[in-house]
Amino acid sequence: GSLGNANIDPYQYLETMTASGSASIAKSSVIINGQNVPYTSVPSLIPDDITWEKVTTYNIGLDLDLFHNRLSFTGDYYRRNTTDLYTVGPNLPQVLGSAAPYGNYASLKTKGWELSLSLRDSFNLGGKPFSYSIKGMLWDSRSWITDYYNETGDLTTYYKGMEIGEIWGFRTAGIYASNADALNGPAYNFFKNGEMFRAYAGDLRFVDVDGDGIMTKGNRTLSNHGDLEIIGNQSPRYQYSINMSLNWNGIGLSMLWQGVGKRDWYPWTESGFFWGKWNRAYNSLMKTQTGDNVVRIDKSTDNWRVTNMDKNPYWTRMVSLAANRNDGPLTWENDHYLQDASYIRLKNITIDYTFPKHICKKLRLEGLKVYLSGENLFTHSPMFKHTDMFDPEVITSGDSDFAASTTSGLNGTGNGYSYPMLKTVTLGINVTF
């Protein structure tokens, strides 16, 4: 079927005059007859052929119920094409005095699938009715830009062929073991205090992808991106949930597990809870930034060398503001500090007991049930090996309470500043009179 998109401001086809501030007419600084002269702005250009965004979905599915409905399977595969996306159009000559108009200039393609498998049964166990159910779900989707006005191939915005969520950055090959080792590596075209950055023992070994002997980011365009490559993707992949429950002799147990099988996240330079003192010298030292997790350098000679290379340290030589300069050595995304933000979480576990009817009758009750429930009690993520300061479930969600956005631009980086999912334990009783 085909649908429109209602999530767009109405009356976009009308040329409207706007003014700064909340008033429809602004006040200028020019005073005539004791009054500020009002003014408004010239309306932006609007294409003549603005129309609805259109979403067309093709779907094929399979449903199976086997063994008297004890085993159920559902599978779906879909393709969704979004056309006439309302976005910015081609640039206009500056002499025209108007910004590029918005119109139906882009399109998007999405492919995805969903699977679910359920198993349920009931029988007598120890002379008492016993029942259980297990349901697992797994789903995935990917989206690509199929049309977008980006004549220069600028990587800081959308472009034709882009997969939503992709992260561009540098490849790395470990850490330099000595100054002599670093001198044999490519020069860094990262300007710090106006000078070419030089690598030392304990710094990251960046990979010279284009082989020109210098680490650069080019013009950050498709045709000239220097040594930048796609190193990851922040979109959640292979999302899943497992729901289990059982009941026997008045005792009930249920669990819900949920997670993401694949997702990348890169900590932005202002993510102080990740970078610690690598961001600013007065920041706290994170507990994972101690011991053999950090390079140890022998500076007794001019040829500095790392003394704990056999421990495979994760954190490079500590350089103040290394991750907080416009062109510092750790400012640009790289696969060494790219975080695996996949996770599995116990969303809920509940244990309950329903009292027998004869006990309820003695208490003059219709029903009595007590329960103990916990939420978000357990979470595991590969990211916790390097930092446990972030909640992987909401790491890209963002909170309006934080001034800085959780994500920065289109490159999948971000502060990760989101309120974590709270752990809660509830003890309750249900009474029916």
Regions found by a protein language model. Name each.
Residues 1-171, 329, 333-433:
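Extracellular/periplasmic, surface-exposed regions of secreted and cell-surface proteins
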Residues 135, 225-226, 236-250, 347-352, ...:
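Conserved SET/PR-domain catalytic core that frames the SAM/AdoMet-binding pocket
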